[in-house]
Amino acid sequence: MPQWIRNSPLPAIQLALLILSAYFLVYRPSILTGALFILLLIRLFQQYGKKSALKVLPILMVFLALFSGHALKMKWEEERIPSSISQLSLRPDSIRINGDQLSFQGRSNGRNYQVFYKLKSQEEQAYFQNLQDLVILTVEAEISLPEEARNFNGFDYRAYLRTKEIYALVKVTEIQEIKARSSWNPMDWIFLGRRKALLHIARSFPSPMRHYMTGLLFGDLDKDFEEMEGIYSSLGIIHLFALSGMQVGFFIDKLRYLLLRLGLKRETVDRLQIPFSILYAGLTGLS
């Protein structure tokens, strides 16, 4: 456990609650989140006294500064969205096809975009359905901001995309050219490997087995699953298709067991868990 947590006068769970309230104060500012944060601070002073509470405040200030800096960065990114775009690097594992509608995540000039395109032919549809390469698209496109929640407590699409570091939508009107691209970014190759694995499972296994595999192993559920979601929900097995911390913990525990059985030292296994966790996060699409 980090030293600053061990030295905190608060139990870890209570410290986490304070940090969580600071997070919502910055990212979801409202009378409710502000009142909750103030109430927790009052309880902190009442329960632990001034001396102990003052030891916790620097930790809270650090997290408030980090959250505020990130929130300002997001606002700055939204204000700097370009008016036009001509090339997009396609992230292959994000491809979704619904009828003649194609969507995917793309990157251009260091920025991420959520991209939409109406397929012009069955050949185009088949190409993107089977795409297993890193490609760059030359396009004609329009850029817009995602919609915010229209109703109280409604779904905020803009806030959702912010969690993925996406600040703008791109509507492609024409794809002029598709070229293969190379990349030295290891995440590109992890995402490509994820795409190949998803396609292999989709072609090799029937429903609902492939939904189990893609959902539990890779955190991905396609359009076919959405059509069956109501049935799975009524049967009470919808949770079996969701990737959760329990499954991640299971895979990491099994990796530790295997490496320890192979004779590796515990310290070495602890170090290997870090790159494995990063690799697995990429294979789940950072979901």
Each predicted region: which residue ranges?
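N-terminal leader/targeting segments
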Residues: 1-80, 169, 179
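Helix-loop-helix junctions and helix-breaking kinks within/between transmembrane helices
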Residues: 23-34, 128-131, 283-287
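Hydrophobic alpha-helical transmembrane segments in multi-pass membrane proteins
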Residues: 18, 30-31, 40-59, 170, ...
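Short N-terminal signal/transit or membrane-insertion segments
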Residues: 36-39, 99-104, 273
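Membrane-interface helix/helix-cap signal primarily in integral membrane proteins
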Residues: 2-4, 66-239
